[in-house]
């Protein structure tokens, strides 16, 4: 059991039939404890401590495996690169503790806005990604628009000191154009930046 969930079964196999004794039971308990500790260590190494989202290391590992499967099975994949707007202003005006709370609030909204099959991660700072697979580019675009609307509703809470919003870039995966996951991220980041610049240049 790990966090109350069954994760597998351990068994002892011998060439000769024999009764299950207390020593065998203790051995199994020790082995199970070792496995659980190892799984916990792996999980902690790939989780962002503040937000409990997958961190950059975890995302890179998972994304590489998923994209390889997508190539082999001709499954479409789309990456959204997300950056919070005016995050520096939140830190400057309200302090870093409030900035951390903003990141946590945003992450909680992210974690519930997408399908369980979508990979949501915090790369670091105020940068996040969502990897969509098995769906169309239009679905990814619609999902991001819907998430923006959800965030706008959350901003209407009377106790809010500031509003959270984001800019994003969407890129369809092509393993010829993006042979490495870093290339895929870089292109999505570039489109996000263009989106952010265009938002700032819009008349208010």
What spans do the regions from the language model cover?
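Amphipathic alpha-helical "output/dimerization" segments
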Residues: 20-37
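Amphipathic coiled-coil signal-coupling helices
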Residues: 38-45, 60, 198, 202
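Conserved long alpha-helical elements within nucleotide-processing catalytic cores of c-di-GMP signaling
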Residues: 56-78, 85-115, 121-125, 129-130, ...
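Sensory-domain boundary capping and coupling elements
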Residues: 1-14
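PAS and PAS-like sensory/regulatory domains
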Residues: 10, 162-167
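Catalytic-core segments of nucleotide cyclases and related cyclic-nucleotide turnover enzymes
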Residues: 137, 141-148, 152, 158, ...
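Short hydrophobic/aromatic beta-strand micro-patches
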Residues: 13, 131-133
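Amphipathic HAMP/coiled-coil signal-transducing linker helices
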Residues: 40-55, 68
């Amino acid at each position: 059991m790990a966090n109350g969930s069954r994760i597998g079964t351990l068994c002892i196999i011998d060439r000769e039939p024999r009764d299950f004794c207390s020593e065998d039971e203790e051995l199994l308990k020790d082995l199970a404890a070792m496995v659980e500790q190892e799984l916990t260590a792996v999980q902690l190494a790939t989780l962002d401590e503040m937000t409990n989202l997958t961190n950059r290391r975890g995302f890179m590992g998972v994304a590489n495996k998923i994209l390889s499967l997508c190539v082999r099975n001709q499954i479409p994949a789309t990456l959204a690169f997300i950056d919070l707007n005016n995050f520096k202003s939140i830190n400057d005006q309200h302090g870093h503790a409030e900035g951390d709370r903003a990141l946590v609030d945003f992450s909680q909204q992210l974690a519930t806005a997408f399908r369980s099959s979508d990979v949501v991660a915090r790369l670091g700072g105020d940068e996040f990604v969502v990897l969509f697979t098995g769906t169309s580019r239009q679905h990814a675009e619609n999902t991001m628009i819907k998430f923006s609307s959800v965030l706008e509703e959350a901003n209407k809470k009377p106790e809010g000191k500031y509003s959270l919003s984001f800019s994003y870039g969407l890129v369809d995966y092509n393993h010829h154009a993006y042979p490495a996951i870093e290339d895929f991220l870089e292109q999505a980041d570039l489109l996000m930046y263009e989106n952010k610049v265009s938002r700032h240049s819009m008349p208010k």
